[in-house]
Amino acid sequence: MQEINGTSHLKMGIAITTYSNEKTSATRIQIIRDSLTSLKMFRNNVEVIIVVDGSYNTDHKKLLDEFNGDFEIIYREKNGGISKAKNTCIKLLLAKNIDIGFLADDDVLYCENWHNAYATSILNTKIDHFVYLPPQIYQSVLRKTTYNNIPVIECTSGGIAGCFMTFTPKIIQQIGYFRIYPYVYGCEHRDFSYRCLKNRLVPNIFDIDNSSNYLKLHHLSLDSSSIIVDKGGLALNIEKKKEYLNKFQEYVECIE
């Protein structure tokens, strides 16, 4: 991607949330290893912070120790949930006076020039909040369009991914941090993006053009073997999720 305005003057930082417990599978730990290894390889001058959300098993801790000399690793005292963990990420990045921040989950794979691709798109489009839309989830509903004459990608179904997103200090100043309510895993990032839309900080929820050349969601991440669940309580968990999502939808409607 051409650097029309150049990005070398920008200070960039990424913060990654991670978590495990005694039920976390070996597959999931390998996913985290692959993610951090790729980031180490293509880090460049980006500040990197790993935020461990209050819980980790033995294998996870061994893995984190291996990267202790490469990344700044912060251990939250207790598991507070994804919103609080993401807020810790934002606070730590802002304290480093970054111009552009990246928030990511621990199952993203990084390719060469990933940071520059997003930073260049931010400069050229004037859109501070991009979200990565993994093709294996959104391929059938992705559409190429342009904004400020720059190619971008939008999701025609209105889907909003949360595994990787960008922000700037201006975004946080105007809409604040992640809200703790609603307590629904997977909805906190939607609320953040909806607020960017509501406050007209972004024209739509976009990803950069050709983002899969720069980021990838780990191919095992959506495999059921990557996360061990209580099969006996699975049906109940699904019903609870539906109930929570209905409440979340009401919440979204009331703020828009």
Swiss-Prot record:
Entry keywords, A to Z: Glycosyltransferase, Transferase
Family to which this protein belongs: Belongs to the glycosyltransferase 2 family.
Top EC category: transferase
Any one Gene Ontology molecular-function term assigned to this protein's record: glycosyltransferase activity
Keyword Transferase on entry: yes
Descriptive protein name: Uncharacterized glycosyltransferase R363
Keyword Transferase (UniProt): yes
InterPro entries per UniProt: Glyco_trans_2-like (IPR001173), Nucleotide-diphossugar_trans (IPR029044)
E.C. number(s) listed in UniProt: 2.4.-.-
